[in-house]
Structure formats: C-alpha cells, structure tokens
Amino acid sequence: AIKERMLERIAFTKPDVVFLNLHGAAVVEGFDDCEGDLLSSIKALVGEGTPIYAVLDLHANVSPLMVKNADLLLGYNTEPHVDIRKRESECVEIYHRQLEEGFVMKTAYAQPPLLLPAINTDTNGGAMTPFIAQAFEYEKQAGVINVSPFAGFYGSDKYNAGPSIICTVTTDVSDAQAICNDISNIFIDKKDSFFVHLDPLDKIISTIKSAPSKKYAVIDECDDPLGGGPADGTYILDKLIEGGINKIGVSTICDREITEMAFAAGEGAVIKGLLGGKTDNKHGRPLPITAVVTKLICKPIPMCEANGEEFADYGETYTDYGRIAVISTEQADIVVTENKVPTEMINIFRHLDIDSNKYSVLVLKGFGHSYKTNFSDKEYVYFTAESIGVNNPDVTKIGEFKKIRRPVYPLDMK
C-alpha cells in the first residue's frame, strides 16, 4: 500500500527529479529486496530521463537492483546518525552541480562476503571510523562524486544483508570499481574489529555483588527496538532478579496488557500479572510480577535529548510511547510502555521525573555508546550482556538465515 501511494503521487506530480530518504534494510513479506523493487518501479514510472537520488542509512543492505535504478545513492557517514540533513542537502547540491556542469555519473558497487553486527559501528572511534576516513580521502580525488561504505544490517534475512560499498564518479566506471574493491578488501581485513566481547550474566552478577557501592549499566543489545527487537525482552531482568540483585531500573519493557492493567488500577494500586516475553519465545519468558503502580504518564517524549547537539538533525521529533506505567517490584522499578519505543538517545528516567541515581543497576535496551552519551554525567560500569534475541551481536546465534548469499563470514567460515 505504501508503494502504491508513492507511485500514485509521483505519477500525479510528474517531477523533474525524485529525491528519496530510504533506510536500505527494510524487509517486507514477499519481497527479498523491497527497496530495490521500489526504486525499479519508480524508475519504470518516471523513465530514464528523470534522475532518482536517494540517501541511505549507514546500515543499509545495498543490492545491485538498488544501484541499477538510482542515479545516486549517498549513505550516512555517521553512527549515531547525526548527518541526515547534511547528506540530504548534499544530494540536492550534487543534482544542481550536475545540471550546471552537465557531467555524467557512473556508479560501481562491491560487497564482501561478511555479515557484521551493528554494535560497534560507531564512526567516532568504533569499527566504521577508518572506513569513513578512507572514503573521505577518495572523495578528494578529481572526478569522485561520492564514496559510501555501508556496515549493513545483520538482522535482515535477505540475499544482500551485510556490508557494501558504493562509489560514484564522473570518470571511467573502472575507477569507481577499483575504489569499491579496495574498501571491500579493507572490510575483510578488519572484520574482527566489528565483533565485541559480550559479558556473561553470571559474571555480571558476581561483579555487582563484589562491589555494591558502584553503579552499573547492563546493555541489552539483543532486544534493540531500533533493530527490530520486540522491546519486551525479560531475559536480563529475569537473571538479575534470580541472582538477588536489587535497586534495578529498567528502560523499557513494552507490554500493552500490563499498561492497561496499571491504568485501570491507578497510582498506588498493586497489580499482578505476567510482564513481557509475549511477542515471541526468543527474548525471555513472561515474568510473574506483583508490583505497585508508582507513576502513570501520558505525554509526548522526545526521541533525542533536546540539549544534545549531536542529535540536532532529529529536530523536534517525538516518539509515540502511548501510555507509560512505572511499576515497582521488590527488586526493580520498570518503565512499561504501551508501544515499542527506542530510548537510547534520551535519559528516559529524567523525562519521567525519576532520579536514576537511586538505582544501583540500570537495564537499558539498545546501543551502549548512545546511552553513554546520555548518562555521561554519572559514573557507570557498563556491561554489554551475553543475552538472547534477534539482535544478538553474536550473529551466529540470531537464528537460521535462509536467504543470505553463501558462504559468508562468520556463518560459514572462521
């Protein structure tokens, strides 16, 4: 339905150029390459004489079909993605340059046989840093319009899941292909830099108990809402409770049933039920709870911290949490949301008027490096937990891949 509406509007407006902001790793039932299909459908509609320019996420799974049907594809150069508007502006600038100068662009593409986790793709010291730096060096060469290395998204079971490189030039396409091949080889050489150590939960619990005066943050990357996780995973919280850990603050668990129960009962009431673990059996069990409803909230909450200059591109973007219930068990305060939402770019406790300093342990879903930015005013010992879920940084433990090209590291080789 989305595709049909887009095509109808494009046909109605008869544009001189089509600008798109696509993620690049979308998955739709019935289409292995839905964004390639979308671009090819738009190209068939507007014809070869109407250019198509698109901006893609750094974690796009770029396919040859996408490259074939777009005149220019630009990837974000940052993780966290703070250059969205900048890359969109560059797209328009390149179009105007092409109109004025009349150059013809040629694009090459390469994809190494890799599947890399997203957890360490930070471009400010993380594994993607040298790739972006190399791309900028190549862009200094005469005739090079753009070089975009993509980390890919490992949670999509599609043929072209994984890292790739696009290079667009005004010289011979062989120049672009040489650049793509070079960066592809660098991906292969540096592949292990993307994989991180995951802390076993029994060791995390032992560490917390051995130094109880410190504050800890346990990151649940395996249930990352921005990566397709259901955000109702309970595995880490379950283990911490079982291990006797107290003063836990949890951000967040999505559970519409518990939220409805809390709002029906009201603040101060005691509720009993099963929390989380209801979307599937991949992120932990539904937890039996007896809890006091301590807060009920219905208000807009920003996607990013208002004072976070690095997230200025997101502007006044608000996330639809739906209704929010904060419930308290003997061992944990849990932020329960009606809708699945990301919280890695904000301190959700502050927005709910909760002092997170009162917690000894925070359990946070999403990227650890983003949380470190938003909790930088506090001294935490950070752990990325060895947990379970569809965003497991150990890509061999995500599940069965049926569509991805083979062989691919690390699924098939060491």
What are the language-model segments listed below?
Residues 1-8, 162, 166, 173, ...:
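N-terminal glycine-rich anion-binding loop in soluble enzyme alpha/beta folds
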